[in-house]
């Protein structure tokens, strides 16, 4: 199908604003009981109030489809408890469980609705079993959550240019992540592992070409399913006394399933990743070494995207004139310009090729001097990952 659109000239002006008020209170309790039982428990409460707005004009006229004002309130309350214990000389076990209540309410265009409300459980389990002094088995199960950015949850339409837009999604839900991993450590240096990741309401931004107008837009959506299964191996080795290397290989099966606008997708892809880290000792007397690292990721998928393979070659010259005190590093990243992502979409009415032309090459010089030991106070950092546009 070929559509003929008349040539037009448009002028777009937009002013956006975001105000966020965030309050968080948490309490943690730890105690060690007899026979090495360590117990911890606690609670946390968080409130957030977000005010997003944008005023957009096309050719000096207000664009009502891209002008909005939206308020959002989120409430979070959680409890957690856990323990850790060493059993004999071989087994170390720790486990915890947290229960968290979340509620989000949106007020936009005179209408209020509850975006999400409910209780979710987040278990954690870590087991380490020493088979003998040289071999060990480690098993880990963990869970976490990821919230969408506040701006992505608004009813906004932001113009990248007169053709491309970024649209918000006021129906985005938090993503829950469950991860399982088992590693076998052989001879204290070789690592062989299996892993599986399951994502509920997986959040990703996809690209859609409008079938009724000369327009395309990006929008973050929740996938129905995103699973990753894989195996990995870490092989360290030395070449003579001057070269120390570590080779990491992994094979993965990725599965994406969901509906984006009017495009259902159910896709699977096998791909691999290779990494090689090398340290060349140039002078032991002068504490001078060269680091050369290479990474390659084979072609994969992301929703309706086909993603080309990417690679990165980096190098760094490290000099320690005063061991454990003064270090100087000259480092270069993406020396061969291999991190330029390329994606392709090939669906009925949706065909596109995209290359990110941003230059990710960089050169940095770092000087580090250690004055002495410093006792850092434990403090909870403010999570700013949801701020901004």
Model-derived features: positions:
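Outer-membrane beta-barrel signature, preferentially recognizing the C-terminal barrel domain
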Residues: 72, 145-194, 198, 216-229, ...
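C-terminal beta-barrel architecture of Gram-negative outer-membrane proteins
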Residues: 274-320, 326, 331-337, 344-345
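Face-selective signature of the C-terminal outer-membrane beta-barrel domain
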Residues: 1-108, 130-134, 138, 190-194, ...
């Amino acid at each position: 199908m070929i559509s003929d659109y008349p040539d037009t000239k448009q002028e777009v002006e937009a002013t956006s604003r975001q105000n966020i008020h965030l309050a968080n209170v948490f309490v943690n309790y730890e105690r060690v009981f007899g026979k090495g039982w360590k117990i911890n428990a606690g609670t946390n409460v968080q409130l957030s109030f977000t005010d997003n707005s944008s005023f957009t004009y096309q050719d000096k006229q207000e664009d009502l489809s891209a002008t909005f004002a939206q308020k959002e309130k989120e409430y979070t309350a959680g409890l957690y408890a856990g323990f850790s214990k060493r059993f004999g000389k071989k087994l170390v076990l720790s486990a915890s469980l947290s229960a968290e209540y979340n509620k989000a309410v949106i007020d936009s265009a005179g209408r209020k609705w509850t975006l999400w409300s409910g209780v979710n459980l987040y278990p954690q389990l870590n087991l380490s079993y020493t088979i003998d002094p040289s071999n060990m088995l480690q098993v880990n199960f963990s869970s976490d959550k990821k919230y969408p950015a506040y701006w992505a949850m608004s009813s906004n339409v932001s113009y990248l240019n007169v053709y491309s837009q970024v649209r918000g999604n006021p129906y985005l839900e938090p993503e829950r992540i469950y991860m399982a991993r088992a590693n076998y450590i052989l001879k204290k240096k070789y690592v062989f592992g299996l892993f599986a990741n399951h994502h509920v309401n997986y959040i990703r931004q996809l690209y859609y070409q409008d079938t009724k107008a000369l327009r395309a837009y990006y929008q973050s959506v929740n996938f129905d399913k995103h699973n990753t299964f894989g195996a990995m191996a870490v092989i360290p080795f030395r070449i003579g006394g001057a070269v120390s290397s570590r080779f990491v290989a992994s094979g993965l099966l990725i599965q994406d399933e969901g509906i984006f606008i009017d495009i259902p997708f159910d896709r699977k892809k096998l791909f691999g990743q290779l990494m090689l880290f090398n340290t060349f000792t140039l002078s032991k007397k002068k504490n001078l070494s060269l680091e050369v690292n290479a990474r390659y990721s084979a072609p994969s998928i992301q929703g309706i995207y086909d993603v080309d393979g990417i690679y990165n070659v980096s190098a760094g010259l490290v000099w320690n004139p005063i061991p454990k005190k003064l270090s100087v590093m000259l480092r270069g990243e993406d020396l061969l310009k291999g991190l330029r992502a390329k994606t392709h979409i090939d669906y009925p009415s949706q065909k596109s090729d995209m290359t990110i032309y941003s230059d990710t090459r960089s050169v940095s010089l770092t000087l580090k001097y250690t004055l002495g030991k410093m006792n850092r106070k434990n403090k909870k950092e403010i999570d700013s990952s949801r701020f901004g546009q």
